[in-house]
Regions:
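Single conserved hydrophobic/aromatic residue that forms the stacking wall/gate
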Residues: 2-13
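Hydrophobic alpha-helical transmembrane segments
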Residues: 41-53, 134-145
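Polar-ligand-bearing catalytic/cofactor-coordination segments
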Residues: 46-53, 58-111, 159-213
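Juxtamembrane "helix exit" motif at the C-terminal ends of alpha-helical transmembrane segments
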Residues: 16-40, 115-141, 150, 154
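Accessory, usually C-terminal, subdomains that scaffold auxiliary metal cofactors
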Residues: 140, 146, 158-163
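Hydrophobic alpha-helical membrane-associated segments
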Residues: 18, 22, 26, 54, ...
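Residue-level hotspots within the lipid-embedded alpha helices of multi-pass solute transporters
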Residues: 20, 49, 108, 112, ...
Length: 213
C-alpha cells in the first residue's frame, strides 16, 4: 500500500538531484577549467554565474517548446489566473478567471531563478573570503550553503509576493519575465480544473491563507 507513495517520493528526490546537478554543480565543474587560465576569483565566479543563468534559460526555453509540456504549462497559466481571481476576492468562475494575468510573483519559476541568483551572490562572497581551488571541495561547500540560499530565496519571495509597491514590483520583474517560457494561455476546461483544485484547499477560516504578512 505504501509502494506508490514511496515511488512518488523517489521521483521527487530524483528531480531535485537532477536540478541541483544541472543548475548548480555542472556550472561549477565547467567553470573550474577557467582556473587553468587565470587566478582571478572574480573571473571564475563571473564565468560560473554566466553558465548557471545560461544553462537555466536554455533548459527552460527548450522544455517550453515540447508539445506535451506546453499543455502542462497551459495548466500552469490556469493555476496562476485562478489564484489571482481568488486573491482579488472575485467569484471563482471561468469568466472571472479567464481575464486574470497568467504571470504570478510567487511562481515556482520565479523561485528557481531567484535561487540561482542568490546562490551566485552567496558563493561569490564566500569564495572571495575563503578561496577554494579544489572543484570537488567547492561543490561540497555549495551543497552545504544550499539551505541558506533556499532560505534567503523563500524570505525574498515571501516579501515580494506580500507587498505591492514600485520596489517589490521591480524586484519581481526578472521572475515574471521568465514565466513567459513556463506559463501559456489556458482553455476553459483547464480553468475549470484549476478552479476545482483551488476550492479543495481554500481554508474555512478567513485569514488562514494570508501571505507575506
Amino acid at each position: 500500500r505504501d509502494q506508490p507513495r514511496s515511488r512518488g517520493l523517489g521521483d521527487v528526490y530524483k528531480r531535485q538531484a537532477f536540478s541541483i546537478g544541472l543548475f548548480m554543480l555542472l556550472p561549477t565543474f565547467l567553470s573550474s577549467f577557467v582556473a587553468l587560465a587565470t587566478d582571478s576569483v572574480l573571473v571564475r565566479n563571473l564565468v560560473d554565474a554566466v553558465l548557471r543563468i545560461a544553462i537555466f534559460m536554455t533548459y527552460m526555453i527548450a522544455v517550453s517548446r515540447m508539445k506535451d509540456i506546453r499543455r502542462v504549462f497551459s495548466y500552469h497559466g490556469a493555476e496562476h489566473k485562478t489564484i489571482f481571481c481568488y486573491e482579488k476576492g472575485l467569484e471563482l468562475t471561468v469568466e472571472n478567471v479567464r481575464v486574470q494575468p497568467k504571470h504570478h510573483p510567487r511562481c515556482g519559476t520565479s523561485f528557481m531563478l531567484v535561487v540561482i541568483i542568490v546562490a551566485i551572490l552567496v558563493n561569490t562572497v564566500v569564495f572571495a573570503l575563503f578561496p577554494v581551488e579544489n572543484v570537488f571541495l567547492r561543490i561540497l561547500v555549495q551543497l552545504a550553503l544550499l539551505p541558506l540560499v533556499v532560505g534567503i530565496t523563500y524570505e525574498f519571495n515571501r516579501y515580494v509576493g506580500g507587498h505591492d509597491n514600485p520596489v517589490t514590483n521591480f524586484l519581481a520583474k526578472p521572475g515574471l519575465w521568465m514565466q513567459n517560457f513556463t506559463t501559456f494561455e489556458p482553455d476553459d476546461s483547464m480553468i475549470e480544473v484549476a478552479i476545482t483544485a483551488l476550492k479543495l484547499v481554500i481554508p474555512e477560516e478567513k485569514g488562514k491563507d494570508a501571505w507575506g504578512k
